[in-house]
């Protein structure tokens, strides 16, 4: 939780034009709940390492970095869970999915076909094993980001966003909605993209930030995530771990499959899709159960599209 956030020194640096805040100090926002005013620290809480707090627009990248270093920020560390492999740790921390009424843990998928226990007992060969793969970043060669400019010369403001995106046709509406523009007043350009793989379908908060800083300064603003932030913030592929039992006949015919899966897709508490397991094979007897751990790590995004 952010307890202090001071950008005055950053703004005072020669060559710095503006500072954009993604977050605020705890206690800043108050909302009414059941007729009472309560503090809402949602936007004062960083949910994972790498979540954006502030951005600086300056004459050069070096000056912008000086501005970022001049920002004073302090945090209170909150309880957190980051070990995606530790199913029992996730349970102990109450980071699984639970039924609202009973409080019982609820699997994401719990599917049985046939009688896998009987098939395993009668099989000629039984193999058990533990398998898994950790969360993986998309590793886009070109990081996420945008270059934004405004034109105030016409009847109303228009925005041009040169955006690293797989979705030129839809991100314009996201910029328009955020800034209260007509869709026709936003132009999105992406002549090439240095990798997206399913992770570049949104205007994103950094795109909005670039556009807002451009609007505030009356100058073009280019905001691209640095490599460290690129690996943490704009989405990853969920992790998946599994204890698997496979049964077969002597001639190699698979007769049964049992698997218990878990992993994380970040704060939402999902994992890989258990409904797709076992992939390719379709044994006549199977039981698949999957659970997700809600972790204080970056969120997931689609993993696909060889571009």
Predicted feature locations:
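Flexible, low-hydrophobicity surface segments
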Residues: 1-105, 126, 206
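Short helix/loop capping segments that flank catalytic or ligand/cofactor-binding pockets
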Residues: 2-3, 29-30, 64-67, 137, ...
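General beta-strand structural signal in soluble alpha/beta enzymes
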Residues: 18-22, 48, 127-131, 161-163, ...
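Short, glycine-/Ser/Thr-/acidic-enriched flexible segments
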Residues: 24-26, 53, 61-63, 132-134, ...
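Glycine-rich and small/hydrophobic secondary-structure elements
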Residues: 35-67, 197-250, 300-307
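Hydrophobic residues embedded in beta-strands of well-ordered beta-sheets
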Residues: 92, 157-159, 254
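Glycine-rich loop/linker segments at domain edges
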Residues: 103-146, 239-307
């Amino acid at each position: 939780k952010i307890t202090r956030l001071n950008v005055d020194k950053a703004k005072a640096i020669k060559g710095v034009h503006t500072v954009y805040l993604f977050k605020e100090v705890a206690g800043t926002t108050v909302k009414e709940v059941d007729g009472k005013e309560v503090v809402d620290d949602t936007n004062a809480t960083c949910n994972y390492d790498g979540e954006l707090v502030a951005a600086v627009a300056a004459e050069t990248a070096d000056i912008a970095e000086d501005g970022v270093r001049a920002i004073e920020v302090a945090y209170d560390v909150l309880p957190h869970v980051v070990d995606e492999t530790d199913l029992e740790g996730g349970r102990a921390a109450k980071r699984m999915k639970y039924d609202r009424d009973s409080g019982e843990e609820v699997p994401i998928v719990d599917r049985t076909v046939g009688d896998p226990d009987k098939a395993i007992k009668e099989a000629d060969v039984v193999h058990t094993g533990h398998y898994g793969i950790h969360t993986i970043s998309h590793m886009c060669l070109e990081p996420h980001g945008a270059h934004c400019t405004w034109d105030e010369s016409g009847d109303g403001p228009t925005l041009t966003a040169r955006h690293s995106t797989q979705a030129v046709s839809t991100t314009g509406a996201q910029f328009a909605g955020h800034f209260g523009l007509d869709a026709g007043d936003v132009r999105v350009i992406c002549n090439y993209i240095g990798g997206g793989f399913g992770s570049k379908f949104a205007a994103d908060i950094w795109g909005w930030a670039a556009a807002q800083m451009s609007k505030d300064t009356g100058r073009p603003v280019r905001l691209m995530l640095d490599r460290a932030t690129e690996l943490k913030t704009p989405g990853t592929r969920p992790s998946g771990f599994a204890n698997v039992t496979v049964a077969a006949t002597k001639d190699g015919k698979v007769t049964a499959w049992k698997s218990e899966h878990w992993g994380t897709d970040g704060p939402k508490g999902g994992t890989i899709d258990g409904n797709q397991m076992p992939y390719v094979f379709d044994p006549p007897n199977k039981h698949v159960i999957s659970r997700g751990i809600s972790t204080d790590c970056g969120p997931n995004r689609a993993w696909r599209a060889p571009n």
